[in-house]
């Protein structure tokens, strides 16, 4: 077996980002053939990624990339198992590279995105597997949203946990960004009143009806109470009916009217929403170890 020099180990480390001992192990296994070592490391990375694929990844970041003409943008949620890894430079660099690839190629879905090439030459999926092997956690590309409009797209990132894109007609990028910030804070369900799902209204009506009947008031009064609460609910969940976060004295709809602008659509992502996290019970874990 040939002697593995420190310089060769460093060369492999610079090319792969793997640890020193990991690089030395693969160089020994391939008799110092650095190209073969990289191949074997990728194979091992895929095996590690496959083993970690079932582990829940509910932390992570939201990333957004937008074209220079501000008319096309993409937003991604990329998950890790822990918040610690979500802040890791290797993870954030990967996420931003994937967002750039998504903006360049505009894939239809995550599966399509996984097959796209990064600027480094590897595919998104290959890079994901290598990152899993390097950091030891499951990494998941959870969801992707593409947006295009003839007006302007504004976006807002609250840290890296909440992301919003807003398509605006006849308005400035600054206004679109302000609306995106409002959406991040106020979490509207739809743009306008007429878009509120009938099912959501009916569910609220049932709740309000049950509450109003307990008041003991005449049915005529109860009906007016219910109608008033329904109208309030619709305003609360529709963007145009919400008080504007920067000036609660006016509603978003009024602001847009004054600016002669129109929100075409918006998308809001929040890290981990809808993912069921496993709750660790450390007492049970310790007791289980004591019993063994």
Swiss-Prot record:
The gene is tsf. NCBIfam families: tsf. The keyword Ribonucleoprotein does not apply. The keyword Protein biosynthesis applies. Associates with the EF-Tu.GDP complex and induces the exchange of GDP to GTP. It remains bound to the aminoacyl-tRNA.EF-Tu.GTP complex up to the GTP hydrolysis stage on the ribosome. One of its GO terms (molecular function) is translation elongation factor activity. PROSITE patterns: EF_TS_2 (PS01127). InterPro entries: EF-Ts_dimer_sf, Transl_elong_EFTs/EF1B, Transl_elong_EFTs/EF1B_dimer, Transl_elong_Ts_CS, UBA-like_sf. This is Elongation factor Ts. Residues 82-85 are annotated as: Involved in Mg(2+) ion dislocation from EF-Tu. GO terms for cellular component: cytoplasm. It is found in: Cytoplasm. It comes from Legionella pneumophila (strain Paris). Keywords: Cytoplasm, Elongation factor, Protein biosynthesis. Belongs to the EF-Ts family. Pfam families: EF_TS (PF00889). Gene3D superfamilies: 1.10.286.20, DNA helicase RuvA subunit, C-terminal domain, Elongation factor Ts, dimerisation domain.
């Amino acid at each position: 077996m040939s002697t593995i020099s420190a310089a060769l180990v460093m060369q492999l480390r610079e090319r792969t980002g793997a640890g020193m001992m990991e690089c030395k192990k693969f160089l020994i296994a391939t008799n110092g053939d650095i190209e073969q070592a990289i191949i074997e490391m990728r194979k091992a990375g895929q095996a590690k990624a496959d083993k970690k694929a079932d582990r829940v990844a509910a932390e992570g970041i939201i990333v957004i990339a937008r074209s220079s003409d501000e008319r096309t943008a993409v937003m991604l949620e990329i998950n890790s198992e822990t918040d610690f890894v979500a802040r890791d430079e290797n993870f954030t660099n990967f996420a931003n590279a994937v967002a750039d690839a998504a903006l360049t190629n505009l894939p239809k879905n995550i599966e399509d995105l996984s097959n796209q090439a990064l600027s480094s030459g590897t595919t998104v999926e290959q890079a994901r597997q290598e990152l899993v092997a390097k950091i030891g956690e499951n990494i998941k590309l959870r969801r992707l949203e593409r947006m295009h409009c003839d007006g302007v797209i504004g976006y807002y990132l609250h840290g890296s946990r909440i992301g919003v894109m807003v398509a605006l007609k006849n308005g400035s990028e600054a206004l679109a960004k302000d609306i995106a910030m409002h959406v991040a804070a106020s979490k509207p369900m739809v743009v306008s009143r007429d878009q509120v799902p009938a099912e959501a209204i009916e569910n609220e009506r049932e709740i309000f009806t049950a509450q109003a009947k307990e008041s003991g008031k005449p049915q005529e009064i109860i009906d007016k109470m219910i109608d008033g609460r329904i109208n309030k609910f619709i305003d609360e969940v529709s963007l145009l009916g919400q008080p504007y976060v920067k000036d609660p004295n006016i509603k978003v709809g009024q602001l847009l009217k004054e600016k002669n602008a129109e929100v075409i659509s918006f998308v809001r992502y929040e890290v981990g929403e809808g993912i069921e996290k496993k709750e660790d019970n450390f007492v049970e874990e310790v007791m289980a170890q004591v019993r063994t």
